[in-house]
Amino acid sequence: MAKDIEASAPEGGEFSAKDYTDPPPAPLIDVEELTKWSLYRAVIAEFIATLLFLYITVATVIGYKHQSDATVNTTDAACSGVGILGIAWAFGGMIFILVYCTAGISGGHINPAVTFGLFLARKVSLIRAVLYIIAQCLGAICGVGLVKGFQSSYYARYGGGANELSDGYSKGTGLGAEIIGTFVLVYTVFSATDPKRNARDSHIPVLAPLPIGFAVFMVHLATIPITGTGINPARSLGTAVIYNKDKAWDDQWIFWVGPLIGAAIAAAYHQYVLRASAAKLGSYRSNA
């Protein structure tokens, strides 16, 4: 384990050293973890967070499509509702809020792709990763189910918020969009939660959730026209299960394969290029 020393410059120009220590890699299988309440508390937090995330965001999508429906709102229907910008803000804003609320309990993953990337980087154990992903998928299904229950007259009519490949785009294009979008998200997660950054910015607790939420916002702006933006397999699965139409299931593999590949690339890039290269070049002083 390496213990690094980072120089910081307070007011007056004098530098003070601040130590930080990288946490040890999580064990692949930690059976003892199953006996701890903290694991189950974290799993519950992931379930509730993903439920709330899907409820708010899918309700926003359905509401926008209803407001912009020319058959319902004949006057300036195209300008009605929150628009794509508002949908992107709903997704990014909810991630910011929920990561802020759950980071100290579960790490605030709320996304199987994030959990998968952190597992590959040995940040979480296999047992925790599997339980998180199950909780996230179940939470997503329940969250979308609430939307359908509360907006039953609009839900099926406006597509149920399901991710589908838009007309005019090939499956390869959709897959590429999901890979790149998830890479941006997971890369941001690694950067925002880096131990060195946490040691430096620990007095500003919003600095981790803010860039993660903003990354989700930006990716949605870029990929909503292509796939409706997945980058979260639980989000795509939850809407497909409740909406349950052929089109949503036909493209479902894109919203699992793409995010998992993107997460794996982000994990490898951060762990074996950025962190490794910094150590080799001596960018940070080390007393280990």
UniProtKB/Swiss-Prot annotation:
<dbReference type="InterPro" id="IPR000425">
    <property type="entry name" value="MIP"/>
</dbReference>
<feature type="transmembrane region" description="Helical; Name=6">
    <location>
        <begin position="254"/>
        <end position="274"/>
    </location>
</feature>
<keyword id="KW-0813">Transport</keyword>
<feature type="transmembrane region" description="Helical; Name=4">
    <location>
        <begin position="172"/>
        <end position="192"/>
    </location>
</feature>
<feature type="region of interest" description="Disordered">
    <location>
        <begin position="1"/>
        <end position="21"/>
    </location>
</feature>
<dbReference type="InterPro" id="IPR034294">
    <property type="entry name" value="Aquaporin_transptr"/>
</dbReference>
<feature type="transmembrane region" description="Helical; Name=2">
    <location>
        <begin position="81"/>
        <end position="101"/>
    </location>
</feature>
<dbReference type="GO" id="GO:0005886">
    <property type="term" value="C:plasma membrane"/>
</dbReference>
<feature type="transmembrane region" description="Helical; Name=1">
    <location>
        <begin position="42"/>
        <end position="62"/>
    </location>
</feature>
<dbReference type="InterPro" id="IPR022357">
    <property type="entry name" value="MIP_CS"/>
</dbReference>
<keyword id="KW-0812">Transmembrane</keyword>
<feature type="transmembrane region" description="Helical; Name=3">
    <location>
        <begin position="130"/>
        <end position="150"/>
    </location>
</feature>
<keyword id="KW-1133">Transmembrane helix</keyword>
<comment type="function">
    <text>Aquaporins facilitate the transport of water and small neutral solutes across cell membranes.</text>
</comment>
<keyword id="KW-0472">Membrane</keyword>
<keyword id="KW-0677">Repeat</keyword>
<comment type="similarity">
    <text>Belongs to the MIP/aquaporin (TC 1.A.8) family. PIP (TC 1.A.8.11) subfamily.</text>
</comment>
<dbReference type="Pfam" id="PF00230">
    <property type="entry name" value="MIP"/>
</dbReference>
<feature type="short sequence motif" description="NPA 1">
    <location>
        <begin position="111"/>
        <end position="113"/>
    </location>
</feature>
<dbReference type="GO" id="GO:0015250">
    <property type="term" value="F:water channel activity"/>
</dbReference>
<feature type="transmembrane region" description="Helical; Name=5">
    <location>
        <begin position="204"/>
        <end position="224"/>
    </location>
</feature>
<keyword id="KW-1003">Cell membrane</keyword>
<dbReference type="InterPro" id="IPR023271">
    <property type="entry name" value="Aquaporin-like"/>
</dbReference>
<feature type="short sequence motif" description="NPA 2">
    <location>
        <begin position="232"/>
        <end position="234"/>
    </location>
</feature>
<protein>
    <recommendedName>
        <fullName>Probable aquaporin PIP2-2</fullName>
    </recommendedName>
</protein>
